[in-house]
């Protein structure tokens, strides 16, 4: 299994167990980002009622049960908020950091990143109110932000990652 980690904080933010797709169904964005679908799962109430054969056992299930989004729960992501102005300042700084990282580690990616990042960020800013933002476990603002949005009538969000801000680690 591959785990995707933030290049600046080592936060684990995704894995290859999620099928990667074109962000926002825009194939050009795939060169710098990827999108994955999340699922809801039930967490808690680990008492499976093995010793309790009564009909009342079903009633006891609700108290400790919580519905969670699998990616948020598995990678301990935390929701964060930005105004459009705050996000603009953050993303400008972050893109410069990623470009510098690429110059040092993957120089062949620098020009692609700089060219493709502009329309991607423009899409985020144009649709800003449709997004929720998440941070990795460290809650470090130097890390990449993970974008979440709901597509159509889906009941769970999709998550979008800037791939040049991540590295893969095999387990």
Curated annotation (Swiss-Prot):
Gene3D superfamilies: Metal Binding Protein, Guanine Nucleotide Exchange Factor, Chain A (2.170.150.10). GO terms for molecular function: calcium ion binding. Keywords: Calcium, Cytoplasm. One of its GO terms (cellular component) is food vacuole. Disulfide bonds: none annotated. PROSITE patterns: TCTP_2, TCTP_3. Its main location: cytoplasm. InterPro entries: Mss4-like_sf (IPR011057), Mss4/transl-control_tumour (IPR011323), TCTP (IPR034737), Translation_control_tumour_CS (IPR018103), Translational_control_tumour_p (IPR018105). Involved in calcium binding and microtubule stabilization. This is Translationally-controlled tumor protein homolog. It comes from Plasmodium falciparum (isolate 3D7).
